[in-house]
Amino acid sequence: MGTLTFRLATVVDAEQIRAIYNHEVMHTAATFDLVPRSLRDQVEWLEARSGAFSAIVAVDVADPAGAVAGEVVGFGALSPYKERAAYRTSVEDSVYVRRDRNGQGIGTLIVRELLSVAATSGFHAVFARINASGEGSIALHRKCGFELVGIELEVGRKFSRWHDVALMQHLIN
């Protein structure tokens, strides 16, 4: 792994973010989206995000393996946890790492960056809703201080089967 840097995502990153996300849509149950995003959808998603809810990208600025310098290797974002006003101090994270870069600590760095954004923005609780069979994502969140607080049974249907969701939570002191 080269040197990683984090920055706010811009529309220039839309195609690389879309490629990472659409791989998960088409090949895994990490997201319950069923239809890949178009480039326009991805640009609109990025343009709709601001402040604490801005997307961040992990960019490899010095990849010794010969990849293009400045490649987006992962992204993350915070989203409002629920619509009702009393939930305003809680957020939900989303973290995606390019498949060929899994296991290199990038996801951990993205989650830690999101926790820092959440703390700076005055949030109290960060939630992660993870496919319960997603052992890697569950382990990643545990490593970052999240605790399992519940399992929602058979709440998603993808690839002709039911999927449970693990609800994990990190309280910010």
Where in this protein do the model-derived segments appear?
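Acetyl-CoA-dependent GNAT
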Residues: L8, L34-D100, V111-R112, V117, ...
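A short beta-loop-alpha structural element at the N-terminal edge
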Residues: T5-I17
